[in-house]
A protein has these predicted regions:
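Positively charged n-region of N-terminal signal peptides that target proteins for export
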Residues: 1-6
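Bacterial N-terminal signal peptides
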Residues: 9-17
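Sec/Tat signal peptide C-region and signal peptidase I cleavage site
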Residues: 21-22
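Structural preference for beta-rich elements and adjacent junctions enriched in aromatics
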Residues: 25-250
Length: 250
């Protein structure tokens, strides 16, 4: 009986030791089950100017996807935001549509604090090596691009790289202070693969990558942090590739 008791005690301790691991595995499974997937259509945009991208995506019947997940109760405001994405032989095409209670475009140059303005963002891991890129664009078409495996120590794109991104904004390209009152705006971007400056990316044909899409406005009257794929963190954070969804490129 003493031996059986010792065996039972050992089994009990082994089971207890496994509980944190099982909980962690369950959390990982839940995280994966919440991840969204999106098929990215390939289109031809040869000689198409950036301002014509919305019309091209209409013609190609590329659907909009909502950016409408409010991840943090402290920031409940949820403007109407949607995006659509396609790709070509040499670039990613992005188109955002927004309706919100105010807009702001104080960051008047690239690599400035565009996240403080009315801002849409595209974060992605294009090469599967853990390095992710953050492309952030305010409502006047000024952008910021960073790259790295973590939030700290990120490398900013040079102006030469930033200039390769073609931008169109329905509000024009001039900076302005906050305008209060419901406003609808759009931006379109042509993002050539060479913008992923830490990699030698030449095509996304047939590839699957992870990514997330965001809307924020740190200094708008209604501060908010929306995402396409949900983020399970206590405080607002977009630099969290563990919560990216999946993009499947044709």
């Amino acid at each position: 009986m003493h031996l059986i008791h010792k065996i039972l005690v050992s089994l009990l301790f082994a089971a207890i030791a496994l509980l944190p691991l099982q909980a962690q595995e369950k959390q990982e499974m839940n995280k994966k089950s919440n991840m969204k997937e999106l098929r990215v259509k390939k289109v031809s945009a040869a000689n198409v100017p950036v301002q014509a991208i919305p019309a091209l995506l209409d013609q190609e019947k590329v659907d909009f996807q909502p950016i409408n997940i409010v991840n943090w109760e402290a920031f409940p405001y949820c403007p109407s935001v949607e995006f659509r994405i396609a790709h070509t032989d040499d670039a990613i095409l992005l188109h955002y549509k927004v309706k919100e209670a105010s807009v702001r475009a104080v960051a008047g140059a690239d690599n400035g604090p565009v996240w403080e303005d009315a801002c849409v963002e595209f974060f992605s891991v294009p090469a599967g090596d853990g390095v992710y890129y953050n492309l952030e664009c305010n409502c006047a078409g000024n952008i910021l691009i960073g790259a790295g495996a973590e939030r700290k120590g990120r490398q900013r794109a040079t102006q030469e790289v930033l200039d390769k991104v073609q931008r169109w904004s329905s509000l024009g390209r001039e900076p302005f202070e906050e305008r209060v009152g419901e406003c609808a705006w759009e931006v379109a971007l042509i993002v050539p693969y060479e913008v992923f400056f830490l990699h030698n990316l030449t095509s996304l044909d047939g590839k699957t990558i992870t990514a997330n899409f965001y809307k924020c406005g740190d200094k708008l009257q209604n501060r908010h942090y929306l995402s396409w794929n949900p983020i399970d963190l206590e405080k607002p954070a977009f630099h969290c590739p563990q919560f990216f969804g999946t993009l499947i490129f044709e």
